[in-house]
Amino acid sequence: MAELRTQPALGRIRQVHMVGIGGIGMSSIAEVLLNRGYDVTGSDLERSDVTERLEAEGATIHEGHAAEQVGTADVVVYSSAVDPDENPETREAERRRISLIPRAEMLGELIRMKFGVGVAGTHGKTTTTSMAGLVVAEGGFDPTVIVGGKVTAFGSNAITGEGDVLVIEADEYDRTFLRLTPSLAVITSIEEDHLDVYEDLAAIQASFTQYANSVPFFGAAILCLDDPNVQAIVGDVERRVVTYGTTRQAEVRGENVRREGMTTRFDVVVRGERLGTIELHVPGMHNVRNALAAVAVGQELEISFERVRDGLGTFTGVRRRFEKKGEVGGITVLDDYAHHPTEIEATLDAAHQGFPDRRVVAVFQPHMYSRTQNFMDEFACSFFNADMLVLTDVYGAREAPIEGVTGGRLAERAEQFGHRAVHYVPEKTDLPGRLQELVGPGDVVLMLGAGDIWRASEAFVELLENDGGTAIERD
């Protein structure tokens, strides 16, 4: 671990207690605070490899929640998964008048201390943040990077550098990204989502516009011109705008895209000047756009193209983003976080690029009842590029069930729209056995969803390994 800074920057705050510290977002903040010399304590419902890693770095972590675990904390930070009115630790903080803040507010404080690069968007945030972090690191800035997923090149979901640049994933859910004031505000895409929070697309666009306008006068909004809903807000952004994409009007443009298996190459043209070729070790046009956002960040920080190219060349993926879980008996099993129709279409496109001439079997666990209800028909049509679709029931997350909103109903709609190979497996635990009956050598099994479908992917790989890598021969 890097040498600790001995002068904390949060006033007289010395001890930070984090409720829900094991979550992907909270744990990255904890790493940064530990690196800056703070005394970090925390709690979560259960221990994990994440909490073990934080304890190895100096945190004190409790399993379960109890009022006394707040201890002598100067501030208590709570996860978005925690109800502050119900949790005993947040209620204890209120009783004792200890500062009690949500995760997003702590992120805002961290970004205030540095030159912030915020990456927002309905799709592509995690990958783009990771790519931008690698570019900034290769540029010699020794950045701090906070990502909503474990990055293969980091070995973690955070880099705790000693430099003055902070690259951070900015989440639009519950408008939390409006607490951030980055110097560079990236917007990768805008689409209808989180309709439990936003009234409609116009409200989502207004929120992203406010985010873009939060940058200081010396900063810039970096916008993807390939996205029609981002195009629509360009005229409302009151700060300097830098555009990127594959369209001819983008200032940072990708051209001559060559897609060969798991490798994607494209040429970079910046304001009419051809700089050279980028080679990515991940498939999909969506990753070309993600990389172009990182190129634009590099341009703003005056990082040489060679450094940008080398930084992107080290990117090999993020956990649960087209992650290979195993290959047994000629069956390849992948896991991906895609949980929106547009993301599903992009991931299926990447699968066919990465594994040409192979059958792609999509296994989808819908995430949240409201999202499934709002996008039922869009989901049903998003799987036409899958040779076979296997559906299980909805992962409710924070929501109660909605009558008539099930994986079975989605399966019916997919068939009604014309998909010719749809299977419904209500119980997720039954997926491994059913998949063993449905797939065979040469198939690519792509598990999709933001819930716990990854458990089924691991169980399926284990089942194949235990059975000697064989699937049941299909007709």
From Swiss-Prot:
Q: Which Pfam families match?
A: Mur_ligase, Mur_ligase_C, Mur_ligase_M
* Biological process terms in GO annotation: cell division; cell wall organization; peptidoglycan biosynthetic process; regulation of cell shape
Which EC class heads this enzyme's classification?
ligase
List the InterPro entries.
Mur-like_cat_sf (IPR036565), Mur_ligase_C (IPR004101), Mur_ligase_C_dom_sf (IPR036615), Mur_ligase_cen (IPR013221), Mur_ligase_N (IPR000713), MurCDEF_pg_biosynth (IPR050061), UDP-N-AcMur_Ala_ligase_MurC (IPR005758)
EC number(s) given by UniProt: 6.3.2.8
Record's subcellular location: Cytoplasm
| Residues that coordinate or bind ATP | 121-127
Q: In which pathway does it act?
A: Cell wall biogenesis; peptidoglycan biosynthesis
Gene Ontology molecular functions: ATP binding; UDP-N-acetylmuramate-L-alanine ligase activity
Q: Which UniProt keywords apply?
A: ATP-binding, Cell cycle, Cell division, Cell shape, Cell wall biogenesis/degradation, Cytoplasm, Ligase, Nucleotide-binding, Peptidoglycan synthesis
What role does this protein play?
A: Cell wall formation.
Q: What is this protein called?
A: UDP-N-acetylmuramate--L-alanine ligase
Protein's gene: murC
